[in-house]
């Protein structure tokens, strides 16, 4: 990279700035250390800093060079520090006859020493002394540091002599690493050179294994802290897996081992090929561009590429939308592919280190846990060997001789439970061009792959290695298209390929009985479908494979499944099942969370879709794996309960156990059952109570809950309380039930949901019933927050008290809602296109209104209030949140209990709900279809 490319003269003109300071000093009447003079010098340097940064940002926007920008900002800082240090030592605190003790070198260390900076990067300085600090030296250091701090810079500093540097580097790996990056800035260069020589001779020599072991352990700890996967959708660009620090670690290791100063020297040594060096430089340049843009855009040292800044960074980098993917998703896919490249480089360099240095460096093998050099053959043709519990290639040409070996490598690793030798993975990565149409259609390769995918051991681990090496995306090109693909929303925590691998991991855990407490039904069902277990693994690999395309990914994915399954060796009937599962993989989740499971038509319609018990079992397990693998905190007991309820109710239909009794007959049976449970009540009181609820109550509420409600209402009547609440935690379902008894009025549910929101209750479901004497019995389910039932009950009782206070007029709801926190900062980056659908076919008794929009505090209260204002009665509400998006379903009738069939009235309802949903939308659209949340 030449000075011409850098255009450093456009960043800062060192001679002009130096001359300006000298002229100011020459014409000054005051002492150079006086406050007025200090202010003038400081302002001059601050102006140069601001101008240089602005120029660097302009140049970044024009040429897009991340490494160029980092070097320009570093040059700017070098220049300012050099001129400031010169002013400090020649003007502020000059020495007439300096002794040797008053020599000093100013050294850049750490990230600054590497020669690249973002705008908010720390400036790490070492004031290097020959001996002990002198009074003159203290004055110079203090003057320099305070000027830098007053310029608004984050400066880390140390003042040490050479002996101290060597001693501390021996004791502290962080200091050793910082000195490894040391770069001379200004002052006594011979002093710095002495430090370099002693560091090489006294610290580096003979400590290579120790250093590498420490750096790799440090990297692993950093990954655990930042997030193990490189596919977290809000990555830390500096510290995350596949980020800048991983590249730094690679260069530290090679620099320490090979005594190189530049990456280019690694090609001469055979560590990297020319193509791999190009990959290293491209990754470094991209990460610098992203990080520099982040610092410029946020005006701070922002290292996390969060949702709220992803759109701006994508725009700054020039990304545009393509069919099926918006500009943010295209940018983030590029980011994750670069992170994957960093992982490839890690494997390549580790392989080179082990191969070229292990024999020559005592103790080196301990780094890679190779306690011996024993080898054994793993295949009849001798192509693969087991070397210290890791699979390796026996010859460099085995992949070229037989490309099926590229799949066989993973098959043998799975069968023998082996890790992968870095040399094998390096050779594999360099042989990816061998994966062509012939290999993809090879029956043996596909047989081996299907056995890997459906392995009874740990298929996710092997598939992950296949993906990291690039083999999986090459062998299944449709999978390659979703590698590193993110979805710009707050619901999905991982890229699409990472999600698919995690789905397979969840299925394997269920199959091994590791999740039987959390998922009892899936744990049982998996034992009954042994013949079809392979189909589940294939489906999970393929169910989201069509994400990022313009059309519905479920339909497009089903077509891909129909094409791929025969290639994998599945029979026509197995292919048909997988195709159906992929097409319907969202259906069970949608029905369970967005429909009234107490409505018989919901169950009958779902049973018509499923048709057989075998498909119902497969779809249930598939749905559990899909939801659980979305990310931490997405799965909860309430979703599990909804899915189990839908499963059991549908099972009754499919096995012929579903009762076809009339509503009147079932109502009569339910009332008789409750009367029997209330047999200890006086007959007159019992009969009066049984006349209170309407038919829908008896057909939808369980008998145990009916009994509990009866005692609840009886106690309220005896106490003369018209308004009362009751709380009941449901630990396994991870929800808490709040029952409200109150005089009925049109906006009651709106007030209750608003009070719930004001009290911090997150509503997931609501059932609304009225009694013949004009009261409402509303049951609200809120997400659980505490581990113990006692704590959760107390919290729910506080929510209930707020509901009572609002309904009784003791508290003013608008004021309470105004105090609630605003939408999360990240949510403001999104726009969810408002959607309202009014459907009369989903229920025999109710009109179903489904709304979709950007979630915000108090939205449910606004929606229910508007629905009430439109003269509609809400029988039940079902609330589903997908990150920033909410999908709410309301089962409603008009005020006389009829469906809403008039088209004009439907149009009016839709317009007003759309207006409400669009009132406070976000800034950008993610362009998702209604089902894309799953």
From Swiss-Prot:
The organism's taxonomic lineage, starting at the top: Bacteria, Pseudomonadati, Pseudomonadota, Alphaproteobacteria, Hyphomicrobiales
Region annotation Uridylyltransferase: where it falls in the sequence: 1-379
Cofactors, names only: Mg(2+)
Residue span of region Uridylyl-removing: 380-736
Domain characteristics, as noted in the entry: Has four distinct domains: an N-terminal nucleotidyltransferase (NT) domain responsible for UTase activity, a central HD domain that encodes UR activity, and two C-terminal ACT domains that seem to have a role in glutamine sensing.
BP-aspect Gene Ontology terms: regulation of nitrogen utilization
UniProt note on regulation of activity: Uridylyltransferase (UTase) activity is inhibited by glutamine, while glutamine activates uridylyl-removing (UR) activity.
Span of domain ACT: 737-818, 848-931
Highest taxon in the source lineage: Bacteria
EC number(s) per entry: 2.7.7.59, 3.1.4.-
Family per similarity comment: Belongs to the GlnD family.
GO MF, one example: [protein-PII] uridylyltransferase activity
Domain HD: from-to ranges: 496-613
Keywords linked to the UniProt accession: Hydrolase, Magnesium, Multifunctional enzyme, Nucleotidyltransferase, Repeat, Transferase
Protein name in the entry: Bifunctional uridylyltransferase/uridylyl-removing enzyme
Catalytic reactions on record: [protein-PII]-L-tyrosine + UTP = [protein-PII]-uridylyl-L-tyrosine + diphosphate; [protein-PII]-uridylyl-L-tyrosine + H2O = [protein-PII]-L-tyrosine + UMP + H(+)
CDD domains reported for this sequence: ACT_ACR-UUR-like_2, ACT_UUR-like_1, HDc, NT_GlnE_GlnD_like
InterPro entries: ACT-like_dom_sf, ACT_dom, HD/PDEase_dom, HD_domain, NT_sf, PII_UdlTrfase/GS_AdlTrfase, UTase/UR
Functional description taken from the UniProt entry: Modifies, by uridylylation and deuridylylation, the PII regulatory proteins (GlnB and homologs), in response to the nitrogen status of the cell that GlnD senses through the glutamine level. Under low glutamine levels, catalyzes the conversion of the PII proteins and UTP to PII-UMP and PPi, while under higher glutamine levels, GlnD hydrolyzes PII-UMP to PII and UMP (deuridylylation). Thus, controls uridylylation state and activity of the PII proteins, and plays an important role in the regulation of nitrogen assimilation and metabolism.
């Amino acid at each position: 990279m030449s000075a011409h490319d850098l255009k450093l003269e456009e960043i800062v003109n060192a001679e002009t700035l130096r001359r300006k300071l000298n002229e100011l000093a020459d014409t000054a009447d005051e002492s150079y250390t006086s406050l007025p003079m200090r202010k003038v010098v400081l302002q001059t340097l601050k102006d140069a800093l601001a101008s240089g940064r602005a120029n660097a940002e302009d140049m970044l926007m024009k040429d897009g060079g991340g490494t160029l920008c980092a070097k320009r900002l570093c040059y700017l800082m070098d220049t300012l520090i050099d001129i400031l240090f010169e002013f400090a030592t020649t003007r502020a605190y000059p020495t007439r006859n300096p002794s040797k003790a008053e020599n000093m070198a100013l050294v850049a260390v750490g990230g600054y020493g590497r020669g690249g900076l973002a705008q908010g990067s720390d400036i790490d300085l070492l004031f290097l002394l020959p001996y002990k600090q002198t009074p003159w030296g203290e004055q110079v250091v203090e003057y320099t540091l305070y000027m830098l701090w007053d310029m608004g810079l984050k400066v880390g500093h140390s003042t040490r002599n050479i002996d101290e540097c060597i001693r501390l580097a021996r004791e502290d790996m962080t200091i050793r690493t910082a000195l490894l990056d040391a770069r001379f800035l200004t002052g006594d260069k011979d002093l710095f050179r002495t430090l370099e020589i002693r560091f090489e001779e006294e610290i580096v020599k003979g400590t290579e294994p120790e250093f590498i072991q420490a750096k790799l352990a440090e990297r692993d700890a950093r990954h655990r802290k930042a997030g193990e996967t490189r596919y977290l959708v809000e990555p830390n660009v500096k510290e995350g897996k596949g980020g800048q620090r991983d590249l730094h670690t690679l260069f530290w290791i090679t620099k320490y081992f090979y005594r190189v100063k530049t990456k280019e020297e690694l090609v001469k040594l055979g560590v990297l090929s020319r193509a791999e060096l190009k990959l290293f430089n491209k990754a470094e340049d991209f990460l610098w561009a992203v990080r520099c843009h982040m610092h410029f855009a946020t005006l701070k040292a922002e290292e996390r590429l969060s949702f709220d800044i992803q759109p701006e960074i994508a725009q700054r980098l020039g990304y545009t939308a393509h069919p099926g993917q918006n500009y943010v998703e295209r940018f983030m896919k590029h980011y994750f592919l670069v992170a994957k490249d960093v992982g490839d480089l890690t494997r390549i360099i580790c392989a080179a280190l082990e191969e070229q240095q292990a024999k020559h460096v005592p103790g080196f093998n301990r780094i890679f846990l190779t306690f011996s050099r024993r080898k054994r053959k793993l295949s009849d043709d001798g192509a693969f060997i087991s070397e210290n519990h890791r699979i390796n290639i026996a010859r460099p040409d085995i992949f070229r001789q037989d490309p099926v070996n590229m799949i066989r490598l993973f098959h043998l690793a799975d069968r023998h439970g082996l890790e992968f030798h870095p040399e094998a993975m390096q050779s594999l990565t360099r042989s990816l061009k061998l994966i062509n149409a012939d290999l993809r259609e090879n029956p043996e390769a596909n047989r081996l792959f299907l056995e890997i995918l459906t392995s009874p051991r740990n298929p996710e681990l092997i598939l992950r290695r296949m993906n990291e090496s690039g083999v999986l995306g090459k062998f299944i090109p449709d999978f390659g298209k979703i590698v590193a693909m993110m979805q710009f929303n707050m619901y999905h925590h991982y890229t699409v390929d990472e999600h698919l691998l995690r789905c397979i991991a969840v299925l394997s855990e269920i199959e091994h009985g590791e999740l039987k407490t959390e998922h009892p039904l899936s744990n049982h069902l998996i034992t009954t479908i042994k013949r079809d277990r392979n189909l589940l693994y294939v489906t999970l690999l393929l169910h989201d494979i069509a994400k990022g395309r313009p059309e519905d990914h479920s339909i497009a994915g089903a077509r891909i499944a129909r094409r791929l399954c025969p290639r994998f060796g599945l029979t026509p009937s197995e292919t048909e099942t997988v195709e159906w599962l992929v097409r319907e993989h969202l259906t069970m989740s949608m029905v369970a969370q967005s429909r009234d499971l107490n409505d018989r038509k919901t169950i009958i319609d779902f049973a018509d879709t499923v048709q057989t018990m075998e498909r119902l079992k497969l779809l249930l397990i598939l749905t559990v794996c899909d939801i659980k693998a979305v990310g931490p905190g997405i799965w909860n007991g309430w979703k599990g309960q909804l899915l189990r309820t839908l499963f059991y109710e549908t099972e009754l239909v499919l096995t012929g156990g579903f009762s076809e009794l009339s509503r009147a007959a079932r109502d009569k049976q339910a009332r008789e059952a409750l009367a029997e449970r209330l047999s200890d009540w006086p007959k007159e009181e019992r009969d009066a109570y049984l006349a209170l609820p309407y038919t829908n109550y008896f057909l939808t509420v369980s008998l145990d809950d009916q009994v509990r409600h009866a005692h609840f209402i009886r106690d309220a009547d005896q106490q003369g309380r018209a308004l009362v609440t009751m709380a009941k935690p449901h630990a396994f379902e991870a929800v808490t039930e709040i029952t409200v008894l109150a005089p009925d009025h049109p906006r009651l549910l709106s007030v209750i949901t608003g009070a719930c929101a004001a009290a911090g209750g997150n509503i997931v479901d609501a059932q609304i019933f009225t009694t013949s004497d004009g009261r409402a019995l509303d049951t609200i389910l809120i997400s659980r927050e505490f581990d113990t039932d006692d704590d959760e009950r107390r919290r729910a009782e506080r929510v209930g008290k707020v509901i009572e206070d609002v309904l009784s007029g003791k508290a003013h709801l608008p004021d309470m809602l105004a105090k609630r926190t605003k939408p999360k900062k990240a949510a403001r980056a999104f726009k969810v296109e408002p959607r309202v659908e009014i459907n009369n076919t989903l229920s025999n008794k109710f009109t179903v209104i489904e709304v979709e929009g950007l979630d915000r505090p108090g939205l449910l209260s606004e929606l229910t209030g508007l629905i009430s204002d439109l003269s509609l009665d809400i029988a039940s509400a079902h609330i589903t949140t997908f990150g920033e998006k909410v999908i709410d379903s309301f089962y409603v009738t008009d005020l006389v209990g009829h469906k809403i069939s008039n088209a004009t009235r439907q149009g009016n309802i839709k317009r007003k709900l759309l207006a409400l949903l669009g009132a406070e939308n976000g800034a950008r659209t993610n362009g998702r279809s209604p089902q894309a949340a799953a």
